[in-house]
């Protein structure tokens, strides 16, 4: 039987030593879980695809009923942000916990259960936002409620933000708050979305804490050629040239490159994976075997594959206006997610070589986010250590630092010196390919994950902000 590593023993000791406010012993967790499920379902039942006002009103009403002061800040009255603060003794800088209240849009016809019903079925809660991001939102709101009810003693203020506009319009949410109201949310550390607990077969295997993320770059491909009559097909057809260019770029395997975070991630992931997967992750570091490993990941684990390089996804194609007219121009919009240290001009030049067609122009897009990408967050900080210990205590699992392949609103805070860590509820690894993941037409979260996520947040927040006696 293998002996626990020194780090595992240290984490276990820290987990056992996490501060527990005296009043926390009085929490009736079965009763709290019932309340938590009601609040979680209520949040999912609010349509916040175009306006977060309904969520803001619910959160404000719920917190104020507990005696927690609430402030609404809005660039647009239909897109309010909620801010609440519980005061500590001031011996340490504040902790910020934030989640976004908006969701992506829906096509109701594609849902088995109505997207805003929060239907409980087969041990899952179904609905838009059930994962992204109302799982974090409810857990943070309930943590604030429990801190207030138990009169928890805090070494630092705990600031809660329910932000608007994360799904593509952060100018109404964190972009606005960071630019116009930063003193009201300034903190030493922040807990937000971006991570997850990974379950397989219903069993939690490991936790991922997002410590860095790719940044959006974007580009367009524009193909041009003579217009003409559709009855006389030409070799210069703009759509044909665009189609070839899109195929070449979509199936290209860009250069793989590790950073400290992804190297640690794959090394640790190999220790908690089944033998076949573990060998595949190890093969990524072997120049003679990495191509086969990458090919497997591209086919079967696109999210994992995307962590290896700057990725390109053709998502919009536009061209033509009439069936019998050869168009003179056709355009493809590319979603590019770049490694934090990617040299984009050089990468665009590589793309041009792959496309290899003078009829197709690559037009770089404007960088998304705020400023230059920042280095990875510390994995030796007290905050990160408490997160590791909390995952160990609640789930009995190890923690892997990870680089997100998508951007979050933490990009608005990290350049300002806030140490931001991305978290998430436990999700089934099998769900993504089955169409049950975030942004899917059957988005869902296991009921047990709802309860465990609240338990984790309670441990983490009291561990980071709780007073040491």
Regions found by a protein language model. Give the residues of each.
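Bacterial N-terminal signal peptides
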Residues: 10-19
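Metal-dependent amide/peptide-bond hydrolase catalytic core
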Residues: 25, 195-205, 209-212, 216-469
């Amino acid at each position: 039987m293998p002996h626990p590593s020194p780090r595992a023993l240290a984490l276990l000791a820290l987990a056992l030593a996490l501060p527990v406010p005296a009043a926390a012993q009085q929490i009736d967790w079965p009763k709290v879980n019932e309340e938590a499920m009601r609040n979680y379902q209520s949040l999912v039942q609010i349509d916040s695809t175009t306006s977060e006002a309904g969520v803001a009103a619910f959160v404000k009403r719920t917190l104020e009923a507990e005696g927690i002061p609430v402030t609404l800040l809005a660039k647009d009255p239909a897109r309010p942000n909620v801010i609440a603060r519980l005061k500590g003794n001031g011996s340490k800088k504040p902790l910020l916990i934030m989640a976004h209240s908006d969701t992506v849009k829906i096509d109701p016809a594609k849902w088995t259960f109505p997207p805003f019903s929060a239907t409980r079925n087969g041990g899952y809660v179904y609905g838009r936002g059930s994962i992204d991001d109302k799982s974090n939102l409810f857990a943070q709101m309930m943590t604030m409620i429990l801190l207030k009810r138990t009169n928890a003693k805090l070494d630092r203020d705990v600031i809660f933000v329910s932000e608007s506009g994360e799904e593509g319009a952060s100018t109404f949410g964190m972009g606005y708050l960071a630019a116009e109201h930063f003193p009201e949310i300034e903190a030493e550390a922040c807990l937000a979305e971006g991570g997850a607990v990974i379950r397989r077969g219903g069993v939690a295997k490991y936790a991922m804490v997002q410590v860095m993320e790719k940044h959006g770059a974007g580009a367009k491909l524009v193909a041009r050629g003579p217009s003409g009559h559709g009855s006389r097909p030409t070799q210069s057809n703009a759509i044909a040239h665009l189609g070839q260019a899109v195929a070449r770029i979509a199936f290209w395997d860009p250069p793989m490159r590790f950073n400290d975070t992804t190297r640690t991630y794959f090394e640790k992931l190999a220790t908690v994976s089944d033998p076949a997967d573990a060998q595949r992750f190890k093969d990524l570091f072997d120049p003679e075997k990495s191509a086969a490993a990458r090919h497997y990941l591209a086919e079967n684990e696109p999210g994992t594959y995307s962590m290896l390089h700057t990725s390109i996804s053709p998502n919009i194609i536009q061209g033509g206006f009439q069936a019998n007219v050869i168009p003179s121009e056709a355009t493809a919009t590319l979603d590019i997610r770049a490694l934090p240290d990617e040299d984009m001009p050089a990468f665009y030049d590589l793309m041009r070589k792959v496309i290899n067609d003078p009829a197709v122009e690559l037009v770089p897009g404007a960088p998304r986010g705020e400023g230059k990408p920042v280095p990875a967050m510390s994995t030796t900080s007290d905050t990160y250590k408490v997160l590791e210990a909390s995952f160990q205590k609640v789930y009995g699992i190890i923690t892997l630092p990870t680089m997100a392949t998508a951007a979050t609103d933490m990009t608005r805070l990290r350049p300002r010196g806030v140490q931001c860590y991305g978290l998430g509820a436990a999700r089934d690894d099998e769900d993504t390919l089955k169409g049950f993941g975030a942004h899917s037409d059957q988005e869902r979260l296991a009921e047990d994950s709802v309860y465990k996520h609240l338990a984790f947040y309670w441990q983490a927040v009291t561990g980071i902000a709780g007073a040491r006696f």
